[in-house]
């Protein structure tokens, strides 16, 4: 009986010592791997910079992970023009055009429709309409001498782009990835591939 009591007492002391060490570790800022992994998984993206075929798309988010700003390459005067869109609670709030040749803006009519969450760029020879949702672009409609084409963007519930569909035909399907992806491959319905690289900043 004495041996059993001694063993139990030793076990109690060991448990107490472990609990004390755990408390001490917490107080000194030393965390378990499990807690660190959980924190890593819960990181909120502040800025995402995506590059595809020489084009750069920038998305910025608030600390709650909501999209607040998007810098999108749109060709108005040259292929280096960009438009900066701002968002509030997932809705389009404003836009600003940075054109390499500002004079060309006089030849383009720009209309923003907040109720439809879209912006239209209309010129003598073509027209483009960008429609947004809480994840970014939801649809692009391009019209010109050859008719109109609509590209629909499909996302999963985490906001990851799954595919771009044009005229009921999958234009690009993207490989599976996490929210922290750094390289993504898109494959069109003809087997052609495009590669997007991304750098991410966190809050």
Residue locations for each model-derived region?
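Buried hydrophobic residues that stabilize the cores of well-folded domains
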Residues: 17-203
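Bacterial Sec-dependent N-terminal signal peptides
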Residues: 1-24
């Amino acid at each position: 009986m004495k041996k059993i009591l001694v063993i139990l007492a030793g076990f109690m002391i060991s448990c107490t010592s472990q609990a004390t060490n755990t408390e001490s570790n917490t107080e000194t800022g030393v965390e378990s791997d499990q807690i660190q992994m959980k924190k890593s998984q819960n990181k909120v993206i502040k800025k995402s910079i995506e590059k595809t075929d020489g084009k750069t798309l920038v998305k910025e988010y608030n600390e709650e992970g909501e999209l607040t700003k998007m810098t999108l390459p749109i060709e108005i005067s040259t292929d280096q023009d960009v438009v900066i869109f701002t968002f509030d609670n997932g809705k389009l709030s404003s836009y600003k055009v940075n054109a390499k040749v500002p004079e060309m803006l006089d030849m383009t009519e720009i209309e923003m429709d907040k109720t439809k969450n879209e912006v239209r760029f209309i010129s003598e020879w073509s027209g483009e309409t960008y429609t947004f949702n809480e994840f970014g672009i939801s649809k692009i409609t391009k019209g010109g001498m050859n008719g109109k084409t609509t590209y629909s963007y499909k996302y999963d519930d985490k906001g990851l782009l799954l595919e771009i569909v044009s005229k009921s035909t999958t234009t690009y399907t993207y490989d599976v990835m996490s929210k922290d992806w750094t390289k993504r491959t898109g494959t069109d319905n003809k087997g052609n591939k495009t590669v997007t690289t991304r750098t991410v900043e966190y809050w």
